[in-house]
UniProtKB/Swiss-Prot annotation:
Species whose genome carries this gene: Sanguibacter keddieii (strain ATCC 51767 / DSM 10542 / NCFB 3025 / ST-74)
Co-factor note (free text): Binds 1 zinc ion per subunit.
Binding site for Zn(2+): C43, C240, H265
Chain segments annotated as transmembrane: none
GO terms assigned for molecular function: ATP binding; cysteine-glucosaminylinositol ligase activity; cysteine-tRNA ligase activity; zinc ion binding
Motif ('KMSKS' region): 301-305
Protein name stated in the entry: L-cysteine:1D-myo-inositol 2-amino-2-deoxy-alpha-D-glucopyranoside ligase
Amino acid sequence: MLTWPAPQIPELPGRGDVVRVHDSSTGRLVVAAEGPSASLYVCGITPYDATHIGHAATYVAFDLLGRAWRDAGQQVTYASNVTDVDDPLLERATATGVEWQDLAVEQTALFAEDMTALGVVPPDVYLGAVETIPPVAAAVEELVAAGAAYRVPLEEGAGGDAPALGDVYADVTADSAFGQVSRMDEATMLELFAERGGDPGRAGKRNALDPLLWRRERPGEPAWEAGSLGTGRPGWHIECAVIARAGLGLPFDVQGGGSDLLFPHHEMSTSHARLIGDGDVHGVGAATHVHAGLVGYQGEKMSKSRGNLVFVSRLRAEGVEPMAIRLALLAHHYRSDWEWTDASLTEGVARFETWRSAVSGNGGPDADATLAEVRAALADDLDAPRALAAVDRWAELSLAGTEKPVEGAPGVVSRAVNALLGVRL
């Protein structure tokens, strides 16, 4: 799958600090990646209703992580996916009378346009669910052979030419570490599993929390040949485990996404990753799990199911400067839940115009301290609001003209804002 064009990242003097992030599993700040390299997997979109502000906030947040790593001198490998076949996509295609493939292509392209406009660095490895069906099917077969997965009988009419081959589910009891990512009690897991695409009440399952690995063919649904599994398509969680393994290897440094992915998605995909290693060596998935807060609108979480969405593409079509949108997102710490309002965007536009005016001259206040403050803020759990405040102070002094101007300082600030915050002035 093709990504979008990569923005140019200016060179800055010196090096950034070691980046620490909040690990959702432990609740502690930890070094995001040790050593000269860093690896990141961010769960991608299901391509319908792209790209809303909640999506954008997540991808901008993890774009900051990649930028901070690069500034610290680390070689970054970033992988992501597109879930281009899944129940919600199929349901939307049916409801709107379009082919699901056409909807996926259209929305994936729109997402790429929005990410380009927002200055998000694209993944190095970018794979769709459809193009990775062969390795996903092989991983599911591996789990079945190891006794970590089992079949559940189908309802009448399902299964195509081989109805005796049931759906395949992972047995969560095969993973002794299951639950260590989210650290939730079983009652909470069951509640969230039911809310977020799971099927705890499915007859024939060994455990209510067992997740789907391979869904057999149903009438009117797309399906692919998969050897001993029978025709069908993959479950959601196993896709990410396999794509992360293919793109980054196991283990990798950080798995990121919205906080609503902590359970079941990241718990399940990490569990699968533990069990699909080669031979006796089992991967542990991500060393650190990092989650972005949720964005609300009109008093509720912004979500596709509620339909209360604000789209990046519509804002762009209305003539809103994409960098102002990015600044509106960066005004909130990535882990916080917050509400999108018209005032959020107004503040982003005003900040963008102020910064652009402040860097327009040949001289300005010394930039060294500002660069150091921005670097320190990002190294401290990607504290974008603190970084923005540092640039605000420099801009205020620059526009006031009360300090002796330092030649070249505006250029340093402009390059720093671009390289570290992803804001082109």
